């Protein structure tokens, strides 16, 4: 049995057509189903529906053989038990700093609100900047508006939400897309099966970008 971990939302919507190229189609609509384990048209393949931030954990610990996760999630994740063989080039966005429009950056310690704590620590350490990191799980845009933080680090798509809240995107930390991740032990035990799937997905990605 091959288990693939996916998260609902944009990544799931963009991944399903790629899996269909490999003949893997869920037997019911994951967006409408309450089931968290969904069979597919291939009897030996099932989908596991989990939170986006949990995909690497399920894959590393062998609860899933493969998964699809945003590069932002993988950058934040600290585990080591994953291969990242393929950029699926879907769910593209940017990981950026943002602050109040026209605000002057303080010269002393910078207060940064984000759910990407590990990314933030690395980013500012590379700059040699002293920062206080405030972990938030949502509504990042509030932090600079009410004086909780000077800046935020978050995923930015169009930037409309930032601008609607009086913020502007600033430094680009990374360009984000979703990646296929594979459990290291699964890659050894089911190498032929998984490699065939990787090859099929790679061809599907390349075909889309030739069009």
UniProtKB/Swiss-Prot annotation:
Pathway: Amino-acid biosynthesis; L-histidine biosynthesis; L-histidine from 5-phospho-alpha-D-ribose 1-diphosphate: step 1/9. The keyword Phosphoprotein does not apply. SUPFAM superfamilies: Periplasmic binding protein-like II. It catalyses: 1-(5-phospho-beta-D-ribosyl)-ATP + diphosphate = 5-phospho-alpha-D-ribose 1-diphosphate + ATP. Signal peptide: none annotated. It comes from the Bacteria. This is ATP phosphoribosyltransferase. The keyword Cytoplasm applies. The gene is hisG.
